[in-house]
Regions:
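Conserved CoA-thioester-binding segment of acyl-CoA-metabolizing enzymes
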Residues: 1-57, 93
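Terminal peptide-recognition signature
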Residues: 17, 21, 36, 54, ...
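Hydrophobic alpha-helical membrane-association signature
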Residues: 32-35, 84-87, 117, 190, ...
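Glycine- (often His-adjacent) and acidic-residue-rich active-site loop
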Residues: 56-91, 110, 223
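Crotonase-fold acyl-CoA enzyme core
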Residues: 93-209, 233-248, 255, 262
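Short, charged, surface-exposed hinge/linker loops at domain edges
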Residues: 216-222
Length: 262
């Protein structure tokens, strides 16, 4: 896979994805969208990948959309945006629904679509210096990248409305208090703690994690009865896995369960 917007490696069942256009602020441009979708596909279908760790190089996590590209040609703007979001939105959906849990590490400013993108991750860790800037209303547009879906679920509907309409910038502590991120980690410990979390998840019951991720997504729109039925069907599927059976036997034998992701 040839990449220009990212660095990518797989180590110990963790797919490590790094935003790698530091000289441009890691923008969510067409190259980003296309390659992010390629990476999402790889992480979805590769059985050796059991968790995903996303971080970034440079002064910013991401400045969000590429305003220079957006403001270049008014006649083509709608077509340009539609083409770019097609790949980006497919990627976000794949990361949200894949079996592998996704961990995002934010060391600095995340703006616009980057905030929406990280809101879709399963875990988000941030340095104290990280900031989260809504950005969209500043240029007269609306949230994309799943922001209108994930932000209300992380922050609550009223808080998400305030964040987006008033074009707020949250500190790392404010983001943690709002539910946008999991926790704030000292900068010197951030990379290690994120890797430990991704590694721990990579050693877990991957297929069960995937079922849980999809149940949590469905819970926002399902009735109680339909969600109970979804749970029953998912439980039937996971109890057929080697991981579930072997873990039950290990617990009965007072041994530590070892999960293989199958």
């Amino acid at each position: 896979m040839k990449l220009t917007a990212f660095a990518f490696e797989i180590k110990d069942s963790v797919a490590h994805i790094t935003l790698d256009q530091a000289d441009r602020g890691n923008p969510l441009d067409r190259h980003f969208a296309e390659e992010f979708n390629e990476l999402a596909t790889e992480c979805s279908i590769n059985p050796d990948i059991r968790s995903v760790l996303i971080d970034a190089k440079g002064r910013f996590f991401s400045v969000g959309g590429d305003l220079n590209a957006l403001a270049k040609d008014r006649a083509e703007l709608a077509h340009f945006v539609s083409a770019a979001t097609a790949d980006l939105h497919m990627a976000i959906s794949r990361f949200a629904r894949m079996n592998a849990p996704v961990v995002v590490v934010v060391h600095a400013l995340a703006a616009g679509g980057a905030v929406a993108l990280l809101a879709g991750a399963d875990f988000v860790l941030a340095a104290p210096a990280a900031k989260f800037y809504a950005a969209f209303s500043a240029i007269g547009i609306i949230s994309d990248s799943g922001g209108s879906y994930f932000l209300p679920r992380r922050m609550g509907s009223r808080r998400a409305t305030q964040f987006l309409m008033l074009n707020e910038t949250l500190t790392a502590e404010e983001a943690a208090e709002s539910g946008l991120i999991n926790r704030v980690v000292a900068p010197e410990a951030l990379a290690d703690e994120a890797w430990q979390l991704a590694s721990r998840l990579a050693q877990g019951p991957t297929l069960a994690f995937g079922e849980l991720k999809n149940l949590l997504i469905a819970s926002a729109t399902e009735t109680l009865e339909s969600q109970l039925e979804n749970e029953a069907r998912a439980m039937a599927r996971v109890t057929r896995t080697d991981d579930a059976w072997n873990a039950m036997q290990a617990v009965l034998a007072k041994q530590k369960a070892t999960f293989k992701g199958r």
